[in-house]
A protein has these predicted regions:
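Extended, well-ordered protein cores
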Residues: 2-256
Length: 256
């Protein structure tokens, strides 16, 4: 990755910080209840669905760390605002300490999170205000809200971003020099105030290095999520998509 590529990622990261801040501010003015509670309510349900969908991979030692990384650091039901604030605070220092690959990983993760925030915000608005769902979130209610929100291209892009992030991590770990450079940044990153970001990158690299090749893992994510996405779009009953992966009829969706 060239210096120019690094600057492109840094510029994109600055844009994403503003986007994330805007979404958080807008959310606080839209919902009657505290937005974090509403969003965590939805995200917790989604995390449970993902844990079930990828339970077969989690059961395999080769893929378990990568599944945990995606469930906790990418799709986790937790507030990422502190991480976003840390990026904003130390942004001027990042280019001097973090490698190009680390910045690329953070940028893709932030892009994915910003898009997920916007989609989740829309889901919460539909569920809470239009559908008046107040108690337990059911697969049927989720499916209906998903269809009402629409944003088909964004949903597909969300899946693609997950796979792009995985591909970046997978490309770095076989290179001992790049992998070592990322690990050597651990001390300086913590001293300069963005250790949480560095730890995020390291967790991803360690998980993907353990996997020894991510094609099967990333293909499974793309095929399963695209299959579920199209099932939801087409109005299928939840029984046809909210199922364990071994019972899922996976469509023919090739990862780009």
């Amino acid at each position: 990755m060239s210096r120019k590529d690094k600057q492109v990622h840094l510029s994109k990261l600055a844009e994403l910080l503003g986007r994330s801040h805007e979404v958080r501010g807008r959310s606080r003015h839209v919902h009657m209840t505290p937005p974090d509670e509403d969003l965590l309510w939805l995200e917790s349900w989604q995390a449970e669905r993902l844990a079930m969908t990828y339970g077969d991979l989690h059961a395999q030692d080769r893929y378990r760390p990568a599944v945990k990384f995606f469930l906790s650091d990418i799709y986790g039901a937790k507030d990422f605002s502190r991480r976003d604030d840390d990026v904003r605070r130390v942004y001027p220092l990042m280019s001097r300490v973090l490698s190009e690959e680390a910045i690329a990983s953070i940028t893709l993760a932030m892009d994915l999170h910003a898009m997920s925030q916007e989609l989740d915000e829309e889901m919460v608005r539909v569920l809470r205000q239009e559908m008046e769902v107040a108690g337990e979130l059911t697969p049927a209610a989720y499916a209906e809200a998903y269809r009402r929100v629409g944003r088909i291209e964004d949903r597909q892009r969300q899946i693609e971003l997950v796979c792009e992030l995985g591909a970046v991590l997978d490309a770095v770990v076989p290179n001992p020099m790049l992998y070592t450079a990322v690990r050597l940044a651990h001390g300086p990153a913590h001293l300069m105030g963005f250790g949480e970001l560095q730890d995020f990158v390291e967790r991803g690299f360690v998980a993907f290095r353990h996997m020894r090749g991510a094609d099967v893992f990333l293909d499974a994510i793309y095929q399963r999520e695209m299959t579920l996405h199209h099932a939801l779009r087409e109005g299928q009953h939840p029984a046809q998509w909210y199922v364990p992966p071994q019972e899922m009829v996976v469509g023919d969706y090739a990862r780009p």
